[in-house]
UniProtKB/Swiss-Prot annotation:
InterPro entries: NA-bd_OB-fold, Primosome_PriB/ssb, ssDNA-bd. The gene is ssb. GO terms for molecular function: single-stranded DNA binding. HAMAP family: SSB. NCBIfam families: ssb. It comes from the Bacteria. It comes from Staphylococcus aureus (strain MRSA252). Residues 104-156 are annotated as: Disordered. This is Single-stranded DNA-binding protein. GO terms for cellular component: nucleoid. PANTHER family: SINGLE-STRANDED DNA-BINDING PROTEIN (PTHR10302:SF27).
Amino acid sequence: MLNRTILVGRLTRDPELRTTQSGVNVASFTLAVNRTFTNAQGEREADFINIIVFKKQAENVNKYLSKGSLAGVDGRLQTRNYENKEGQRVYVTEVVADSIQFLEPKNSNDTQQDLYQQQVQQTRGQSQYSNNKPVKDNPFANANGPIELNDDDLPF
């Protein structure tokens, strides 16, 4: 039997860290994972998958990941159930993570946004041709008609 789940997605909220009665740290979060196909409107839908992680990895997740962080999760699928206050049986399916990869540095979303803003400010008011770089000559500019190539001239 095999129960293995590998996911890559973005956190939809900050992780929640708590400690069990026996003193074990547990972090939980939801991962948004894009589907590989588009719907009838041409939009890509996402699945929102609950993740739990234990012990030291739970501490690291809480410390280094936040809403919007890109993460890779390797774990197993688990379904548990409990009885709620109304006496109804509630089933919960989640991924119990064995390993979590932080796929971008903390606050990289902010850094990428800052870099984009700097680029916009630097190029604002400039034409794409006024960057004072020499334009490379087109070696085929004066070619009249098709260019003849021999197979022996190709590097592959």
